[in-house]
From Swiss-Prot:
It catalyses: N-terminal L-lysyl-[protein] + L-leucyl-tRNA(Leu) = N-terminal L-leucyl-L-lysyl-[protein] + tRNA(Leu) + H(+); N-terminal L-arginyl-[protein] + L-leucyl-tRNA(Leu) = N-terminal L-leucyl-L-arginyl-[protein] + tRNA(Leu) + H(+); L-phenylalanyl-tRNA(Phe) + an N-terminal L-alpha-aminoacyl-[protein] = an N-terminal L-phenylalanyl-L-alpha-aminoacyl-[protein] + tRNA(Phe). One of its GO terms (molecular function) is leucyl-tRNA--protein transferase activity. It is found in: Cytoplasm. GO terms for cellular component: cytoplasm. The keyword Metal-binding does not apply. InterPro entries: Acyl_CoA_acyltransferase, Leu/Phe-tRNA_Trfase, Leu/Phe-tRNA_Trfase_C. This is Leucyl/phenylalanyl-tRNA--protein transferase. The keyword Translocase does not apply. The gene is aat. NCBIfam families: aat.
Amino acid sequence: MKETRSKQPDITPDMLLRAYSIGLFPMADSADDPELFWVEPEIRGIIPLDRFHVSRSLAKVIRRRPFDIRFDTAFSEVIEGCAQRAPDRPTTWINDTIRALYAALHKMGHAHSVEAWEGDTLVGGLYGVSLGAAFFGESMFSRRTDASKICLVHLVQRLRSKGFQLLDTQFTTEHLKSFGAVDVPKVEYEVLLAKAIASPNLDF
């Protein structure tokens, strides 16, 4: 995996969008480290939108509508949820610089959140970046069983309905593979990315 170190003051929202358009995304070593670095994986994770898979058990849960699913009503709160430590996530790479950059992208209409609510309580969500006909998933969190999974299902439904071509997950995990995520070589990913980026920016 290639990394390029860059001091955080150099990165602007416009630079961040440009980076996404050529296959780069930023990370930090920890929440307390102000420095960001660019990541360019040799193997990229994507979820082919036409091969997204929902298990029977999860489909059954979704039919019960356990959560109110909303879009872009609590973007900063979703990032905070993703930044919090959890039993399966003892450390986080989301620092103050990441928060500020993605908040700016949200105001520009390029960063979005999918949220699971129980009444007035946010119990799960995910966020990512839209550019052209591509959506780049960044992070997700869950405070109730299946909350983030259900947000992912609603994200894919939204992307399909709007005509998106690419859902980039950056890396794959066993969790994402259960939904149909696959690893693709960098060269193949670049072709998919170029096609999606060539599209006008789609409404999310």
